[in-house]
């Protein structure tokens, strides 16, 4: 596929993403070489927590949880979701080359979430999708 830097992840608790609750196994392709290792939330200064409250019921529930996670005043579940988002967005930031380490990627994702920029982008995306729905009708 031509990718130059990729992280394939699978958590010990069965998620196909980086887990807030357990160790995550990683196969990282970088500079033509694959390295396998594991990571935990504590390695990036995030406290490991259960996934209780993060199970999504439907798209409306998902949107509400994301708004809570990205908002200025977060509930306890919103805090947990924000950490889960930072863990996974941090990987994307790292493999995109914006940072030189996964830990730096998570820190940048955390700053973007807590600085309000992530919620601003979500609002822009939400408004854009509303305009698309007008064309479907």
Descriptions of predicted regions:
Residues 1-137:
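Glycine-rich anion-binding loops and their surrounding alpha/beta cores
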